[in-house]
Amino acid sequence: MLQAAGGYSIDMKFWWHIEWPEEIRRRTFLHLRNNKDGRLISINVLEYAGIIITFVAATHYFLSNPRDTDLQPVARLVADNSASESWIVKACTRSAIGRALGRVQCALMINNPVGLDCDHVCSKDNKVADGLSRIEHASNAASYFSSLKQRYPELAGCRRFRPSSKLISIITAAICQQKLVDPVAKSQQLLSDLGRTIL
């Protein structure tokens, strides 16, 4: 999770993977030993960003596959990081980066018919998402995912979701610059270009 992030849903038939930009990786525990200068980007922040991206993929799924019987679906996501799980439901109060990401989450939820809920999963039961987070380079993602499908056959029907460049840019700015977006102003822009699913 310190170099890349990934997530999936068997029910919604998607998986995703992104490499964190160098400006984020340089500020993780891979390169900084402490937070004396306030520059460290914690794993909690990266896990929270990952949940937000998974919510975006879930929103894309529900908007692309509307159901007459469920006009207000809820994406029930699971995570193995208690801080990020709490931030999804209650918002972050201490971390400036967490608060900035909270505004991105807000922007994605305004006028969105898809709700969000989060449950806990033990790290030992989160092997697929952890595997997607450990792909070293995006160019290796397809072949690595093929090997994951061999280990976890339930992934066979999943397609790759690519978050929009605008979303990744806003998330990166929130993480690196603690940039606070105006949720009302950004909502329609983000919801109109969530990303796309590819084979």
Model-derived features: positions:
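A structural signal for well-ordered alpha-helical segments within the folded catalytic domains
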Residues: 48-52, 56
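C-terminal functional segments of enzyme domains
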Residues: 111-168
